[in-house]
Amino acid sequence: MLKKIIILFLGVFVLSGCTDSFRGYFQKSANNRLVDSKGFKGGKRKPLYNNKYISLAKKNIVEDNLDDPEDDDDDYDNPLRGEQIDPVKRNREIYLKMIRRDMEKYKAESGESSDDDDMTLSKANKKVRKDNTDKERKMQEELDQIKAMLRETKRDISKYTCPNATANQNYVPPVSNYEPVAPVKNNKPYNNNSKVKQKFIREDDDYSSNACSI
């Protein structure tokens, strides 16, 4: 019984290769998985694109850096030419839609409305005033912090005094109002016969005589 089930399953799997629809079911999704519910959108699988290629295509469209193929002369006379789908134009529209979605997503995340595409003079003035107000507020906050630090430093300095500035309890200021003192009188008479005095008298006489001879 088990062999019959295995043979039946293998037969169904081999016969499924003859039909494109059933074979396409086993194709891998965009996330490179065989069974992936996120790979489906609207009953169709997402195409397996390279993110780098998508970013480059968006950049080329925004910068208008496109290499449009030249129209062939043979297709110019084709009556069905207008009904054919231009792949370049189709891809361009696809990437333009992706760019618009990215812009809307960016505006939604940044909180900007869709009406703010064009910056008017009044909006610019409001923005400038707001920036100036913010700068003034920050400067005032910094100034208040500096003042608070200065007050705190002043309080700390007032708690301490210099050791050299302490008052000396034994210090006595100098006296400036002296009382006049009477000169001391010597009651003893001078000794004119003193040897020292006689010596000085002789030296003075010799000096005066020498000065006159010169």
Swiss-Prot record:
PROSITE patterns: PROKAR_LIPOPROTEIN. Residues 1-17 form the signal peptide. This is Uncharacterized lipoprotein RBE_0877. GO terms for cellular component: plasma membrane. Residues 64-77 have a biased composition (Acidic residues). It is found in: Cell membrane. Keywords: Cell membrane, Coiled coil, Lipoprotein, Membrane, Palmitate, Signal. A lipid is attached at C18 (N-palmitoyl cysteine). Residues 64-83, 106-138, 166-197 are annotated as: Disordered. A lipid is attached at C18 (S-diacylglycerol cysteine). The keyword Disulfide bond does not apply. Residues 120-162 form a coiled coil. It comes from Rickettsia bellii (strain RML369-C). It is a lipid-anchor. It comes from the Bacteria.
